[in-house]
């Protein structure tokens, strides 16, 4: 089972969010983690919107989340918050599905004002699901260069601090100790 699941909440196949996640997955794999990137847009829309957690494709991702040691939950900012696509997936998970897990929230957006989406939109939802929410990060769209396969890059102003946060996240996941929570 993957030690880290990356939930990609962008509805676009060529998103800047996905480009950043590809770079992070490569970094985490280099640290020895098993990483599974899940583009939520590829899940079947009917079962996703109906919150059918028993549909095979949905159940597979729910199981991956349940067994992961850590998660990166990422989304572009739409209307000052994370995407409805990501919200639809989070809504079908059990209330405390992220209990005891280390989670890194990541948001991309076109305006520096959207940095607030990390702490005021995404973080509260993840915390309400029991996650240990680590340092989040916002990447300004203009600092992301999307290229062909393996050709995406981040400007140094975004890359250095983000990789530092990802390295700390990697260490937290590596030192993971299961916690049993009785509700």
Q: Model-found features: residue ranges?
A:
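N-terminal beta1-alpha1-beta2 submodule of the flavodoxin-like/Rossmannoid cofactor-binding fold
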Residues: 1-94, 160, 167-183
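A short small-residue
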Residues: 1-6, 47, 102, 138-150
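Short coil/turn segments at secondary-structure junctions
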Residues: 8, 73, 105-109, 149, ...
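Alpha-helix initiation/capping motif
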Residues: 13, 50, 54, 111, ...
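Short connector loops at helix/strand junctions that flank enzyme active sites
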Residues: 67, 98-101, 117
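Short, conserved loop/helix-junction motifs that constitute active-site signature segments
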Residues: 95-99, 130
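Short, glycine-/small-residue-rich phosphate/pyrophosphate-handling segment
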Residues: 103-144, 156-160
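Glycine-rich phosphate/pyrophosphate-binding loop and the adjoining helix
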Residues: 132-183
């Amino acid at each position: 089972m993957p030690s880290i699941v990356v939930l990609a909440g962008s509805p676009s196949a060529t998103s800047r969010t996905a480009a950043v996640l590809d770079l992070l997955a490569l970094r985490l794999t280099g640290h020895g983690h098993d990483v599974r990137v899940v583009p939520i847009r590829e899940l079947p829309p009917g079962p996703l919107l109906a919150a059918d957690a028993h549909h095979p494709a949905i159940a597979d991702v729910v199981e991956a989340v349940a067994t992961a040691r850590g998660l990166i939950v990422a989304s572009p900012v739409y209307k000052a918050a994370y995407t409805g696509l990501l919200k639809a997936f989070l809504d079908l998970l059990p209330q405390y599905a992220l209990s005891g897990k280390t989670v890194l929230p990541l948001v991309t957006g076109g305006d520096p004002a959207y940095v607030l989406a990390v702490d005021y939109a995404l973080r509260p939802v993840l915390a309400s699901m029991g996650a240990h929410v680590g340092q989040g990060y916002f990447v300004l769209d203009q600092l992301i260069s999307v290229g062909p396969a393996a050709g995406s890059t981040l400007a140094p102003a975004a890359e250095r601090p983000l990789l530092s946060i990802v390295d700390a996240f990697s260490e937290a996941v590596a030192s993971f100790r299961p916690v049993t929570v009785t509700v």
